[in-house]
Amino acid sequence: MSYLKSVDEIRSLIAKLKKGNTLWLDTEVADYDTRNPRLSLIQVLDDCKDLTGESVYILDVLEQPEIVAEFIEEIMINSSIEKVFHNAKYDLRFLGKKKAQNVICTLEMAKKIPYYILPLPNYQLKTLAIELCHFQDIDKQHQSSDWGIRPLSEEQIEYAYLDCIILAQVHSRLLEITQQTD
C-alpha cells in the first residue's frame, strides 16, 4: 500500500494508472454530512488479484483541488479505463459527476441480480463481501470517522486500503454470478 500526499507523487501515479484497463476506486470524504463536503482520499487498486494491498494507492487529496481536477481529467473522463465503484453515484459527486466515463457500480450490479439468486437483506459492500466472498471481521466503524483531520490514524488508513481490496473481490464474484445467469 502506498500513501501518497505530494502533488508530484500523485501526478506520477496518475501517469501510471492511465495505462491500465480497470481500476477499483473508493473515496473518503471529510464533512460528508455538511453543506460543504471535502474530498479527503481517493483509494485506487489496479490489480484485482492483489489481496495483500501492495497494489492499493491512497491519494491524500484534501485541500488539493488541482490534483483532483487532474485525476478527473486523466482517469475519470478517460473512456478506455474501466472504473469500478460501490455506490458510484456518491463517489462521482467528487470525481467528475456526469463527465466520468466507463463507470461500473457494484451496487447497481447486485441490484440487477434476481433475489432468488442473490437473496440478501441489503446490498451494502460489507454484506456483499461477507456473503459472496466470505470475508470476516469487516469493520466499518471508520467509515464515518473524521477524514478531515491530519494525520489520519493507522486504523483509518487500514480501513481505506481494505475497501478497494474488498470491492475488487465483490466485483469479481458479481461478474461470475451475472455470467452464470445470462
PLM features: residue spans?
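Short, intrinsically disordered, charge-balanced linker/junction segments flanking boundaries
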Residues: 180-182
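Conserved DEDDh/DEDDy metal-dependent 3′-5′ exonuclease domain
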Residues: 2-25, 30-177
